[in-house]
A protein has these predicted regions:
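Bacterial N-terminal signal peptides that target proteins for export
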Residues: 1-10
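Hydrophobic alpha-helical targeting segments used for export or membrane insertion
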Residues: 10, 14-16
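C-terminal motif of bacterial Sec signal peptides marking the signal peptidase cleavage site
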Residues: 18-21
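Low-complexity, intrinsically disordered segments exposed to solvent
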Residues: 23-282
Length: 282
């Protein structure tokens, strides 16, 4: 009987160890921290893209001397709290119940962006909030703040960017919480009012411990670090190049490679020896 108990105990211990090892292996190929970070990142990049679009159309992009004109959306109603050229000025963009337009995405609800000065002027702060705002069925909440920090060493305008209390509620009812601290460099397109030639490079915020942190749809906390600047072209929905490191709590750091500059929704996720392709939502 004693021998049987010992053997049973050994077998049980071995089985537990084996199952634990299998569970750990499965968990370490989990894509949701990377995918959900991309959803949140894309949501708040798109939020800024819409603000930039409407700012350009209404003369907020540069020196407020001219407007660019309608580029895509016919359905949002855009109003201002003060006459053009006066600050602070809150731009309210109302998409109503449904508006398919800029970059082909369906939006509803309201975006509010308060400018303390022209977009391209050093010292300007832009604070963006939402009211019952949805993109392709996902509800976007939170506050995004951009501060125009003037020119960097390369002579390009750059912005410090913060997202506070970001919350994405997916169509399934699952949620992603997200906060971010970034630096956004305006690399190309500053000299024109056209949006499609604007290119931004996004890196970790100056002095920040990480680029973003959040909790994915499965309740797992994660942080991110931008290993190579994420390049955002304003005529493309997705990040076109750059490398992002994502570290879920208690798990191996993943590397998300956004590609070679092509405008597509593909990214390569690497976790140790495991590699897979993921499809970016936007």
């Amino acid at each position: 009987m004693k021998l049987f108990i010992v053997k049973t105990t050994c077998i049980t211990a071995f089985a537990v160890a084996l199952l634990s090892g299998c569970k750990k292996e499965r968990a370490d190929t989990d894509i949701y921290a990377s995918l959900d970070n991309s959803i949140a990142d894309g949501s708040f990049n798109d939020l800024q893209a819409v603000v930039n679009q409407q700012a350009a159309e209404n003369g907020f992009a540069g020196l407020l001397s001219e407007t660019y004109g309608k580029v895509a959306d016919d359905c949002p109603t855009t109003t201002f709290s003060a006459p053009l050229g006066e600050f602070p000025n809150t731009m309210t963009i109302d998409f109503g119940e449904s508006c398919v337009g800029y970059l082909g995405l369906e939006r509803s609800g309201i975006i509010m962006a308060t400018f303390t000065g022209p977009y391209a002027t050093a010292g300007t702060t832009i604070t963006v909030t939402t009211d019952n705002y949805y993109v392709n069925g996902n509800k976007i909440e939170g506050t995004k703040t951009l501060v125009n920090e003037g020119l960097n060493d390369d002579g390009n305008i750059y912005f410090s960017v913060a997202v506070v209390d970001g919350l994405i509620t997916l169509e399934t009812g699952e949620t992603i919480s997200w906060d971010a601290t970034r630096t956004r460099e305006w690399r190309e397109g500053e000299g024109t009012l056209a949006l499609e030639d604007d290119i931004y490079a996004i890196s970790d915020g100056i002095g920040a411990d990480f680029a973003a942190s959040g909790i994915n749809r499965n309740g797992v906390a994660f942080t991110t670090h931008i290993a190579e600047p994420l390049v955002k072209e304003m005529d493309c929905i997705w990040i076109v190049s750059g490398i992002l490191e994502v570290t879920p709590e208690g798990l191996t750091t993943r590397e998300l490679d956004f590609g070679d500059g092509s405008c597509d929704n593909n990214a390569t996720l690497t976790i140790g020896a495991f590699t897979t392709e993921i499809t970016l939502p936007y």
